[in-house]
Protein backbone atom coordinates (compact mmCIF):
# COMPACT_ATOMS: atom_id res chain seq x y z
CA UNK A 1 0.00 0.00 0.00
CA UNK A 2 1.35 3.35 -1.03
CA UNK A 3 1.76 6.19 1.46
CA UNK A 4 0.84 9.57 -0.08
CA UNK A 5 0.59 11.83 2.96
CA UNK A 6 -0.47 12.09 6.56
CA UNK A 7 -2.03 14.56 8.95
CA UNK A 8 0.37 16.22 11.35
CA UNK A 9 -1.80 17.33 14.27
CA UNK A 10 -1.08 16.35 17.89
CA UNK A 11 -1.96 12.90 19.09
CA UNK A 12 -5.49 12.42 20.43
CA UNK A 13 -6.80 9.24 22.03
CA UNK A 14 -10.20 7.71 21.46
CA UNK A 15 -11.63 4.44 22.68
CA UNK A 16 -13.83 2.37 20.40
CA UNK A 17 -15.81 -0.82 20.70
CA UNK A 18 -15.95 -3.37 17.94
CA UNK A 19 -19.22 -4.01 16.23
CA UNK A 20 -20.60 -7.53 16.42
CA UNK A 21 -21.12 -9.31 13.14
CA UNK A 22 -24.87 -9.25 13.63
CA UNK A 23 -26.48 -6.30 11.89
CA UNK A 24 -29.18 -6.11 14.50
CA UNK A 25 -26.62 -5.32 17.15
CA UNK A 26 -25.27 -2.24 15.40
CA UNK A 27 -25.26 0.75 17.78
CA UNK A 28 -27.56 3.59 16.96
CA UNK A 29 -26.84 7.13 18.15
CA UNK A 30 -29.81 9.39 18.77
CA UNK A 31 -27.61 12.42 19.29
CA UNK A 32 -25.37 12.68 16.24
CA UNK A 33 -24.41 16.24 17.01
CA UNK A 34 -23.09 15.44 20.48
CA UNK A 35 -21.45 12.32 19.10
CA UNK A 36 -19.57 14.44 16.63
CA UNK A 37 -18.41 16.71 19.42
CA UNK A 38 -16.99 13.74 21.29
CA UNK A 39 -15.38 12.01 18.32
CA UNK A 40 -14.30 14.86 16.06
CA UNK A 41 -10.66 13.92 15.73
CA UNK A 42 -10.58 10.20 15.11
CA UNK A 43 -8.63 9.10 12.07
CA UNK A 44 -8.96 12.46 10.39
CA UNK A 45 -7.10 14.76 12.74
CA UNK A 46 -4.46 12.57 14.31
CA UNK A 47 -1.20 11.26 12.97
CA UNK A 48 -1.55 8.62 15.66
CA UNK A 49 -4.79 7.18 16.92
CA UNK A 50 -5.87 4.08 18.73
CA UNK A 51 -6.61 0.79 17.23
CA UNK A 52 -10.07 -0.52 18.21
CA UNK A 53 -8.50 -2.73 20.82
CA UNK A 54 -6.85 0.32 22.37
CA UNK A 55 -3.30 -0.12 21.06
CA UNK A 56 -1.78 3.09 19.65
CA UNK A 57 -0.98 2.77 15.97
CA UNK A 58 0.21 5.13 13.27
CA UNK A 59 -2.59 6.37 10.99
CA UNK A 60 -1.14 6.73 7.51
CA UNK A 61 -2.82 7.67 4.27
CA UNK A 62 -2.69 4.53 2.18
CA UNK A 63 -4.13 3.79 -1.23
CA UNK A 64 -6.51 0.86 -0.98
CA UNK A 65 -6.41 -0.95 -4.32
CA UNK A 66 -10.13 -1.72 -4.36
CA UNK A 67 -11.10 1.90 -3.61
CA UNK A 68 -8.58 3.14 -6.18
CA UNK A 69 -9.97 0.81 -8.87
CA UNK A 70 -13.53 1.94 -8.19
CA UNK A 71 -12.47 5.59 -8.26
CA UNK A 72 -10.66 5.17 -11.58
CA UNK A 73 -13.59 3.36 -13.20
CA UNK A 74 -16.09 5.98 -12.01
CA UNK A 75 -13.81 8.85 -13.00
CA UNK A 76 -13.51 7.50 -16.54
CA UNK A 77 -17.00 8.94 -16.97
CA UNK A 78 -15.47 12.41 -16.70
CA UNK A 79 -13.40 11.86 -19.83
CA UNK A 80 -16.65 12.42 -21.73
CA UNK A 81 -16.93 16.08 -20.74
CA UNK A 82 -13.20 16.69 -21.06
CA UNK A 83 -13.06 15.21 -24.53
CA UNK A 84 -16.00 17.34 -25.66
CA UNK A 85 -14.42 20.54 -24.28
CA UNK A 86 -11.13 19.80 -26.00
CA UNK A 87 -12.44 18.51 -29.29
CA UNK A 88 -15.01 21.29 -29.80
CA UNK A 89 -12.29 23.94 -29.60
CA UNK A 90 -10.86 22.60 -32.87
CA UNK A 91 -13.97 21.09 -34.43
CA UNK A 92 -15.77 24.46 -34.57
CA UNK A 93 -13.10 25.73 -36.99
CA UNK A 94 -14.26 23.13 -39.52
CA UNK A 95 -17.97 23.00 -38.57
CA UNK A 96 -18.27 26.75 -39.25
CA UNK A 97 -17.01 26.35 -42.81
CA UNK A 98 -18.56 22.96 -43.62
CA UNK A 99 -22.07 23.81 -42.40
CA UNK A 100 -21.74 27.53 -43.22
CA UNK A 101 -23.01 28.73 -39.83
CA UNK A 102 -22.63 32.08 -38.07
CA UNK A 103 -20.66 33.01 -34.95
CA UNK A 104 -23.93 33.18 -33.00
CA UNK A 105 -24.78 29.62 -34.05
CA UNK A 106 -21.28 28.54 -32.99
CA UNK A 107 -21.86 30.01 -29.53
CA UNK A 108 -25.23 28.25 -29.25
CA UNK A 109 -23.67 24.98 -30.44
CA UNK A 110 -20.82 25.16 -27.93
CA UNK A 111 -22.88 26.38 -24.98
CA UNK A 112 -25.87 24.09 -25.54
CA UNK A 113 -24.09 21.07 -24.05
CA UNK A 114 -23.40 22.94 -20.81
CA UNK A 115 -26.90 24.40 -20.55
CA UNK A 116 -28.52 21.02 -21.23
CA UNK A 117 -26.23 19.36 -18.72
CA UNK A 118 -28.22 21.37 -16.17
CA UNK A 119 -31.08 18.91 -16.76
CA UNK A 120 -28.89 15.91 -15.97
CA UNK A 121 -27.35 17.61 -12.93
CA UNK A 122 -30.74 18.43 -11.39
CA UNK A 123 -32.12 14.95 -12.08
CA UNK A 124 -29.02 13.06 -10.97
CA UNK A 125 -29.51 13.55 -7.22
CA UNK A 126 -32.97 12.00 -7.09
CA UNK A 127 -31.99 9.35 -9.64
CA UNK A 128 -28.92 8.22 -7.70
CA UNK A 129 -30.89 8.07 -4.45
CA UNK A 130 -33.46 5.81 -6.13
CA UNK A 131 -31.45 3.46 -8.36
CA UNK A 132 -28.03 3.75 -6.74
CA UNK A 133 -24.74 5.40 -7.64
CA UNK A 134 -23.50 2.62 -9.94
CA UNK A 135 -26.51 2.53 -12.22
CA UNK A 136 -26.60 6.32 -12.41
CA UNK A 137 -23.06 6.12 -13.81
CA UNK A 138 -24.32 3.64 -16.42
CA UNK A 139 -27.22 5.95 -17.27
CA UNK A 140 -24.81 8.88 -17.73
CA UNK A 141 -22.56 6.90 -20.06
CA UNK A 142 -25.46 5.51 -22.11
CA UNK A 143 -27.00 8.95 -22.57
CA UNK A 144 -23.71 10.46 -23.69
CA UNK A 145 -23.13 7.52 -26.04
CA UNK A 146 -26.38 8.28 -27.87
CA UNK A 147 -25.43 11.96 -28.09
CA UNK A 148 -21.96 11.17 -29.45
CA UNK A 149 -23.40 8.93 -32.17
CA UNK A 150 -25.89 11.63 -33.18
CA UNK A 151 -23.11 14.24 -33.39
CA UNK A 152 -20.82 11.95 -35.37
CA UNK A 153 -23.54 11.24 -37.95
CA UNK A 154 -25.00 14.77 -38.07
CA UNK A 155 -25.85 15.88 -41.64
CA UNK A 156 -26.98 19.36 -40.58
CA UNK A 157 -26.77 21.99 -37.85
CA UNK A 158 -30.15 21.02 -36.33
CA UNK A 159 -29.15 17.33 -36.18
CA UNK A 160 -25.86 18.30 -34.57
CA UNK A 161 -27.73 20.40 -32.00
CA UNK A 162 -29.93 17.41 -31.13
CA UNK A 163 -26.81 15.37 -30.41
CA UNK A 164 -25.42 18.16 -28.23
CA UNK A 165 -28.63 18.28 -26.19
CA UNK A 166 -28.62 14.52 -25.51
CA UNK A 167 -24.89 14.46 -24.77
CA UNK A 168 -25.33 17.43 -22.43
CA UNK A 169 -27.86 15.55 -20.30
CA UNK A 170 -25.38 12.67 -20.00
CA UNK A 171 -22.60 15.07 -18.99
CA UNK A 172 -24.85 16.55 -16.29
CA UNK A 173 -25.40 13.12 -14.76
CA UNK A 174 -21.70 12.33 -15.00
CA UNK A 175 -20.43 15.52 -13.35
CA UNK A 176 -22.49 14.95 -10.22
CA UNK A 177 -22.30 11.20 -9.80
CA UNK A 178 -18.59 10.52 -10.40
CA UNK A 179 -17.15 12.65 -7.55
CA UNK A 180 -20.07 11.77 -5.26
CA UNK A 181 -19.53 8.03 -5.75
CA UNK A 182 -15.78 8.33 -5.26
CA UNK A 183 -16.19 10.44 -2.09
CA UNK A 184 -18.56 7.88 -0.57
CA UNK A 185 -16.19 5.02 -1.43
CA UNK A 186 -12.92 6.60 -0.28
CA UNK A 187 -11.17 6.41 3.12
CA UNK A 188 -10.94 9.85 4.78
CA UNK A 189 -7.16 10.22 4.50
CA UNK A 190 -7.05 9.62 0.73
CA UNK A 191 -10.44 11.06 -0.21
CA UNK A 192 -8.93 14.28 -1.55
CA UNK A 193 -6.71 12.42 -4.00
CA UNK A 194 -9.34 9.91 -5.07
CA UNK A 195 -12.16 12.47 -5.39
CA UNK A 196 -9.95 14.70 -7.53
CA UNK A 197 -9.56 11.89 -10.08
CA UNK A 198 -12.70 12.99 -12.01
CA UNK A 199 -10.98 16.34 -12.67
CA UNK A 200 -7.80 14.49 -13.66
CA UNK A 201 -9.82 12.50 -16.18
CA UNK A 202 -11.55 15.65 -17.44
CA UNK A 203 -8.10 17.02 -18.24
CA UNK A 204 -7.05 13.74 -19.83
CA UNK A 205 -10.20 14.00 -21.95
CA UNK A 206 -9.36 17.59 -22.92
CA UNK A 207 -5.86 16.52 -23.95
CA UNK A 208 -7.27 13.61 -25.98
CA UNK A 209 -9.64 16.06 -27.66
CA UNK A 210 -6.75 18.34 -28.59
CA UNK A 211 -4.74 15.41 -29.93
CA UNK A 212 -7.78 14.25 -31.91
CA UNK A 213 -8.10 17.74 -33.41
CA UNK A 214 -4.44 17.84 -34.37
CA UNK A 215 -4.47 14.31 -35.83
CA UNK A 216 -7.72 14.56 -37.79
CA UNK A 217 -7.51 18.19 -38.94
CA UNK A 218 -5.80 17.20 -42.21
CA UNK A 219 -8.72 14.97 -43.30
CA UNK A 220 -11.39 16.27 -45.70
CA UNK A 221 -13.57 18.89 -44.04
CA UNK A 222 -16.83 16.94 -44.34
CA UNK A 223 -15.23 14.05 -42.45
CA UNK A 224 -12.78 15.43 -39.88
CA UNK A 225 -15.15 17.16 -37.43
CA UNK A 226 -17.62 14.26 -37.55
CA UNK A 227 -14.88 11.81 -36.59
CA UNK A 228 -13.66 14.19 -33.88
CA UNK A 229 -17.11 14.25 -32.25
CA UNK A 230 -18.06 10.63 -32.93
CA UNK A 231 -14.95 9.20 -31.26
CA UNK A 232 -16.44 10.23 -27.91
CA UNK A 233 -18.61 7.11 -28.12
CA UNK A 234 -15.65 4.85 -27.23
CA UNK A 235 -15.02 6.07 -23.65
CA UNK A 236 -18.78 5.96 -23.07
CA UNK A 237 -18.81 2.26 -24.00
CA UNK A 238 -15.79 1.61 -21.76
CA UNK A 239 -17.56 3.21 -18.78
CA UNK A 240 -20.75 1.22 -19.33
CA UNK A 241 -18.77 -2.04 -19.37
CA UNK A 242 -16.37 -1.11 -16.56
CA UNK A 243 -19.17 -0.36 -14.12
CA UNK A 244 -19.84 -4.10 -13.86
CA UNK A 245 -16.64 -4.41 -11.80
CA UNK A 246 -17.51 -1.54 -9.44
CA UNK A 247 -19.05 -1.96 -5.97
CA UNK A 248 -22.07 0.06 -4.91
CA UNK A 249 -21.51 3.01 -2.57
CA UNK A 250 -21.53 1.70 1.03
CA UNK A 251 -23.29 4.85 2.24
CA UNK A 252 -26.10 4.40 -0.27
CA UNK A 253 -26.41 0.76 0.84
CA UNK A 254 -26.69 1.90 4.46
CA UNK A 255 -29.41 4.41 3.58
CA UNK A 256 -31.32 1.58 1.88
CA UNK A 257 -30.93 -0.63 4.96
CA UNK A 258 -28.65 -3.12 3.18
CA UNK A 259 -26.14 -3.22 6.02
CA UNK A 260 -24.66 -6.63 5.22
CA UNK A 261 -23.76 -5.56 1.68
CA UNK A 262 -22.38 -2.26 2.98
CA UNK A 263 -20.15 -4.10 5.45
CA UNK A 264 -18.76 -6.37 2.72
CA UNK A 265 -17.86 -3.35 0.56
CA UNK A 266 -16.26 -1.57 3.53
CA UNK A 267 -14.13 -4.61 4.36
CA UNK A 268 -12.72 -4.47 0.82
CA UNK A 269 -11.98 -0.73 0.88
CA UNK A 270 -10.61 -0.55 4.44
CA UNK A 271 -7.20 -1.46 5.81
CA UNK A 272 -8.60 -3.82 8.45
CA UNK A 273 -11.91 -5.42 9.33
CA UNK A 274 -11.98 -3.36 12.53
CA UNK A 275 -11.69 -0.14 10.54
CA UNK A 276 -14.53 -1.30 8.30
CA UNK A 277 -16.73 -1.91 11.34
CA UNK A 278 -15.95 1.53 12.76
CA UNK A 279 -16.77 3.21 9.45
CA UNK A 280 -20.01 1.27 9.23
CA UNK A 281 -20.94 2.36 12.76
CA UNK A 282 -20.45 6.02 11.80
CA UNK A 283 -22.58 5.59 8.68
CA UNK A 284 -25.38 3.83 10.55
CA UNK A 285 -25.31 6.53 13.21
CA UNK A 286 -25.60 9.27 10.58
CA UNK A 287 -28.37 7.44 8.70
CA UNK A 288 -30.36 6.61 11.83
CA UNK A 289 -30.08 10.21 13.04
CA UNK A 290 -31.73 11.21 9.75
CA UNK A 291 -34.41 8.56 10.21
CA UNK A 292 -33.46 6.61 7.09
CA UNK A 293 -32.47 3.33 8.69
CA UNK A 294 -32.55 1.64 12.05
CA UNK A 295 -29.99 -0.71 13.42
CA UNK A 296 -32.34 -3.64 13.19
CA UNK A 297 -33.62 -2.90 9.71
CA UNK A 298 -32.71 -4.92 6.70
CA UNK A 299 -34.41 -2.74 4.15
CA UNK A 300 -35.50 0.83 3.61
CA UNK A 301 -37.94 2.53 1.28
CA UNK A 302 -36.09 5.83 1.42
CA UNK A 303 -35.76 7.50 -1.99
CA UNK A 304 -34.64 11.00 -1.06
CA UNK A 305 -38.07 12.31 -0.12
CA UNK A 306 -38.21 15.67 1.66
CA UNK A 307 -34.65 16.58 0.71
CA UNK A 308 -35.49 19.56 -1.53
CA UNK A 309 -37.71 21.00 1.19
CA UNK A 310 -34.91 20.73 3.73
CA UNK A 311 -32.37 22.20 1.33
CA UNK A 312 -34.36 25.13 -0.06
CA UNK A 313 -37.42 25.85 2.09
CA UNK A 314 -36.49 25.06 5.68
CA UNK A 315 -32.69 24.81 5.85
CA UNK A 316 -31.02 25.03 9.25
CA UNK A 317 -28.17 27.50 9.76
CA UNK A 318 -25.49 24.82 9.19
CA UNK A 319 -27.21 23.65 5.99
CA UNK A 320 -27.39 27.25 4.75
CA UNK A 321 -23.66 27.59 5.32
CA UNK A 322 -23.02 24.35 3.46
CA UNK A 323 -25.19 25.53 0.55
CA UNK A 324 -23.37 28.86 0.38
CA UNK A 325 -20.00 27.09 0.36
CA UNK A 326 -20.98 24.47 -2.25
CA UNK A 327 -22.83 26.84 -4.59
CA UNK A 328 -20.15 29.51 -4.16
CA UNK A 329 -17.23 27.30 -5.13
CA UNK A 330 -19.16 25.96 -8.15
CA UNK A 331 -20.16 29.46 -9.25
CA UNK A 332 -16.61 30.79 -9.13
CA UNK A 333 -15.25 27.68 -10.84
CA UNK A 334 -17.14 28.61 -14.00
CA UNK A 335 -17.13 32.39 -13.49
CA UNK A 336 -13.36 32.07 -13.90
CA UNK A 337 -14.07 31.62 -17.61
CA UNK A 338 -11.90 28.50 -17.79
CA UNK A 339 -14.31 26.45 -19.92
CA UNK A 340 -14.99 29.37 -22.26
CA UNK A 341 -11.26 30.06 -22.69
CA UNK A 342 -10.67 26.40 -23.55
CA UNK A 343 -13.66 26.17 -25.91
CA UNK A 344 -12.58 29.30 -27.76
CA UNK A 345 -8.81 29.03 -27.31
CA UNK A 346 -8.22 29.07 -31.10
CA UNK A 347 -10.17 32.35 -31.28
CA UNK A 348 -8.17 33.73 -28.35
CA UNK A 349 -4.86 32.75 -29.96
CA UNK A 350 -6.03 34.04 -33.34
CA UNK A 351 -6.79 37.37 -31.70
CA UNK A 352 -3.27 37.22 -30.27
CA UNK A 353 -1.82 37.01 -33.78
CA UNK A 354 -1.61 33.26 -34.56
CA UNK A 355 -3.55 32.55 -37.78
CA UNK A 356 -2.36 29.18 -39.15
CA UNK A 357 -4.97 26.51 -38.27
CA UNK A 358 -2.36 23.83 -37.65
CA UNK A 359 -0.46 26.17 -35.33
CA UNK A 360 -3.68 27.12 -33.53
CA UNK A 361 -4.50 23.48 -32.84
CA UNK A 362 -0.87 22.75 -31.91
CA UNK A 363 -0.81 25.48 -29.24
CA UNK A 364 -3.94 23.99 -27.68
CA UNK A 365 -2.11 20.65 -27.32
CA UNK A 366 0.59 22.42 -25.29
CA UNK A 367 -2.15 23.97 -23.15
CA UNK A 368 -3.72 20.55 -22.62
CA UNK A 369 -0.40 19.04 -21.50
CA UNK A 370 0.07 21.86 -18.98
CA UNK A 371 -3.45 21.37 -17.58
CA UNK A 372 -3.03 17.62 -17.22
CA UNK A 373 0.37 17.90 -15.52
CA UNK A 374 -0.79 20.41 -12.91
CA UNK A 375 -4.05 18.65 -12.07
CA UNK A 376 -2.06 15.46 -11.41
CA UNK A 377 0.32 17.44 -9.22
CA UNK A 378 -2.58 18.94 -7.28
CA UNK A 379 -4.27 15.57 -6.83
CA UNK A 380 -1.09 14.04 -5.38
CA UNK A 381 -0.70 16.79 -2.77
CA UNK A 382 -4.36 17.48 -1.97
CA UNK A 383 -4.42 15.24 1.10
CA UNK A 384 -1.05 16.50 2.33
CA UNK A 385 -1.50 20.27 2.01
CA UNK A 386 -5.29 20.40 2.29
CA UNK A 387 -8.04 21.98 0.19
CA UNK A 388 -7.72 25.62 1.28
CA UNK A 389 -4.02 26.30 0.48
CA UNK A 390 -4.26 24.86 -3.04
CA UNK A 391 -7.61 26.54 -3.70
CA UNK A 392 -6.32 29.96 -2.60
CA UNK A 393 -3.10 29.50 -4.59
CA UNK A 394 -5.02 28.47 -7.69
CA UNK A 395 -7.59 31.28 -7.62
CA UNK A 396 -5.01 33.99 -6.84
CA UNK A 397 -2.77 32.63 -9.61
CA UNK A 398 -5.67 32.70 -12.05
CA UNK A 399 -6.41 36.33 -11.18
CA UNK A 400 -2.80 37.32 -11.93
CA UNK A 401 -2.61 35.20 -15.12
CA UNK A 402 -5.90 36.54 -16.52
CA UNK A 403 -4.76 40.09 -15.77
CA UNK A 404 -1.56 39.36 -17.71
CA UNK A 405 -3.60 37.95 -20.59
CA UNK A 406 -5.75 41.07 -20.58
CA UNK A 407 -2.64 43.25 -20.65
CA UNK A 408 -1.15 41.37 -23.61
CA UNK A 409 -4.44 41.40 -25.52
CA UNK A 410 -4.90 45.13 -24.91
CA UNK A 411 -1.40 45.87 -26.19
CA UNK A 412 -2.03 43.87 -29.37
CA UNK A 413 -5.29 45.75 -29.95
CA UNK A 414 -3.40 49.05 -30.19
CA UNK A 415 -0.31 47.70 -31.94
CA UNK A 416 0.11 47.49 -35.69
CA UNK A 417 3.18 45.25 -35.59
CA UNK A 418 2.03 42.37 -33.32
CA UNK A 419 5.38 42.04 -31.47
CA UNK A 420 6.48 38.53 -30.62
CA UNK A 421 6.77 39.31 -26.90
CA UNK A 422 3.08 40.28 -26.68
CA UNK A 423 2.01 37.12 -28.53
CA UNK A 424 4.24 35.04 -26.24
CA UNK A 425 2.76 36.80 -23.18
CA UNK A 426 -0.76 35.86 -24.28
CA UNK A 427 0.16 32.21 -24.91
CA UNK A 428 2.03 31.91 -21.59
CA UNK A 429 -0.77 33.69 -19.70
CA UNK A 430 -3.44 31.34 -21.10
CA UNK A 431 -1.34 28.29 -20.19
CA UNK A 432 -0.70 29.74 -16.72
CA UNK A 433 -4.40 30.48 -16.16
CA UNK A 434 -5.53 26.96 -17.04
CA UNK A 435 -2.65 25.50 -15.00
CA UNK A 436 -3.62 27.46 -11.88
CA UNK A 437 -7.21 26.36 -12.48
CA UNK A 438 -5.99 22.75 -12.50
CA UNK A 439 -4.14 23.31 -9.22
CA UNK A 440 -7.10 24.80 -7.36
CA UNK A 441 -10.66 25.21 -8.59
CA UNK A 442 -10.52 22.32 -11.06
CA UNK A 443 -10.11 19.35 -8.70
CA UNK A 444 -11.15 20.97 -5.41
CA UNK A 445 -14.62 22.04 -6.56
CA UNK A 446 -15.62 18.41 -7.16
CA UNK A 447 -13.98 17.25 -3.92
CA UNK A 448 -15.65 19.93 -1.84
CA UNK A 449 -19.10 19.61 -3.43
CA UNK A 450 -19.22 15.88 -2.80
CA UNK A 451 -17.94 15.84 0.79
CA UNK A 452 -19.52 18.70 2.77
CA UNK A 453 -23.22 17.73 2.60
CA UNK A 454 -24.61 15.36 5.27
CA UNK A 455 -25.51 11.86 4.10
CA UNK A 456 -29.24 12.45 3.68
CA UNK A 457 -28.65 15.57 1.54
CA UNK A 458 -25.45 14.63 -0.25
CA UNK A 459 -26.77 13.47 -3.63
CA UNK A 460 -29.36 16.19 -4.18
CA UNK A 461 -27.28 18.90 -2.50
CA UNK A 462 -24.38 18.09 -4.83
CA UNK A 463 -26.71 18.06 -7.82
CA UNK A 464 -28.00 21.53 -6.90
CA UNK A 465 -24.48 22.96 -6.56
CA UNK A 466 -23.32 21.38 -9.81
CA UNK A 467 -26.44 22.66 -11.59
CA UNK A 468 -25.25 26.18 -10.76
CA UNK A 469 -21.86 25.17 -12.16
CA UNK A 470 -23.45 24.02 -15.42
CA UNK A 471 -25.70 27.07 -15.75
CA UNK A 472 -22.85 29.54 -15.35
CA UNK A 473 -20.66 27.52 -17.72
CA UNK A 474 -23.40 27.44 -20.36
CA UNK A 475 -24.15 31.16 -20.12
CA UNK A 476 -20.45 32.04 -20.43
CA UNK A 477 -19.92 29.64 -23.33
CA UNK A 478 -22.92 31.12 -25.19
CA UNK A 479 -21.90 34.75 -24.64
CA UNK A 480 -18.09 34.74 -24.42
CA UNK A 481 -17.41 35.54 -28.08
CA UNK A 482 -20.19 38.12 -28.41
CA UNK A 483 -19.18 40.00 -25.25
CA UNK A 484 -15.47 39.78 -26.10
CA UNK A 485 -16.02 41.25 -29.54
CA UNK A 486 -18.14 44.04 -28.10
CA UNK A 487 -15.82 45.05 -25.24
CA UNK A 488 -12.61 43.41 -26.65
CA UNK A 489 -10.85 40.28 -25.46
CA UNK A 490 -8.55 42.33 -23.25
CA UNK A 491 -11.44 43.88 -21.31
CA UNK A 492 -13.08 40.44 -20.97
CA UNK A 493 -9.96 38.97 -19.42
CA UNK A 494 -9.63 41.88 -16.99
CA UNK A 495 -13.25 41.24 -15.92
CA UNK A 496 -12.51 37.54 -15.36
CA UNK A 497 -9.40 38.47 -13.36
CA UNK A 498 -11.55 40.67 -11.13
CA UNK A 499 -14.02 37.81 -10.68
CA UNK A 500 -11.20 35.54 -9.54
CA UNK A 501 -9.99 38.14 -7.06
CA UNK A 502 -13.48 38.22 -5.52
CA UNK A 503 -13.53 34.41 -5.52
CA UNK A 504 -10.25 34.26 -3.62
CA UNK A 505 -11.71 36.44 -0.86
CA UNK A 506 -14.85 34.26 -0.75
CA UNK A 507 -12.81 31.06 -0.41
CA UNK A 508 -10.72 32.55 2.39
CA UNK A 509 -13.70 33.48 4.53
CA UNK A 510 -16.31 30.81 3.76
CA UNK A 511 -14.58 27.50 3.02
CA UNK A 512 -13.20 25.58 6.05
CA UNK A 513 -10.51 22.93 5.71
CA UNK A 514 -11.84 19.37 5.33
CA UNK A 515 -8.55 17.50 4.89
CA UNK A 516 -8.48 14.10 6.57
CA UNK A 517 -11.95 14.21 8.09
CA UNK A 518 -14.51 11.48 7.48
CA UNK A 519 -17.69 12.50 5.68
CA UNK A 520 -19.59 12.07 8.94
CA UNK A 521 -17.17 14.41 10.78
CA UNK A 522 -17.18 17.21 8.22
CA UNK A 523 -20.64 18.35 9.29
CA UNK A 524 -19.15 19.41 12.64
CA UNK A 525 -17.25 22.18 10.84
CA UNK A 526 -20.58 23.80 10.03
CA UNK A 527 -22.66 22.64 13.02
CA UNK A 528 -20.53 22.87 16.16
CA UNK A 529 -17.67 25.28 15.78
CA UNK A 530 -19.63 27.74 13.66
CA UNK A 531 -22.53 27.83 16.12
CA UNK A 532 -20.15 28.39 19.03
CA UNK A 533 -17.76 30.71 17.21
CA UNK A 534 -18.89 32.57 14.07
CA UNK A 535 -15.27 33.08 13.03
CA UNK A 536 -14.54 29.35 12.89
CA UNK A 537 -14.88 29.24 9.12
CA UNK A 538 -11.74 31.33 8.87
CA UNK A 539 -9.63 28.62 10.46
Task: List PLM regions with ranges.
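Alpha-helical transmembrane bundle of multi-pass membrane proteins
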Residues: 2-271, 278, 288-539
Amino acid sequence: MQVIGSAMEPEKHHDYHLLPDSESALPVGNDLKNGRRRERATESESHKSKHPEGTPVHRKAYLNKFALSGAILASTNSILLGYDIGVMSGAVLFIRENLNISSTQIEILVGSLNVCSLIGSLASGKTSDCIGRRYTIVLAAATFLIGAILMGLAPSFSFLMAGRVVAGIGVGYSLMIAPLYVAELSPALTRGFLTSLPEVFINVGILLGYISNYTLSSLPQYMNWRLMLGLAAFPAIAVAVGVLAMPESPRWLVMKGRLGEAKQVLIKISETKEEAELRLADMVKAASFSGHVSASSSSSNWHGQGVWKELLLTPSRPIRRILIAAIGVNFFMQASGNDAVIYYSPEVFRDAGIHNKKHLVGVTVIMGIAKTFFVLLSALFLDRFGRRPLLLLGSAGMAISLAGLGLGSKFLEYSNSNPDWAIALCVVAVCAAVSFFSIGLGPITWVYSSEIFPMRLRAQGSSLAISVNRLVSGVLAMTFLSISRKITFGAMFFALAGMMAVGTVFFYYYLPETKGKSLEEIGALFEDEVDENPKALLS
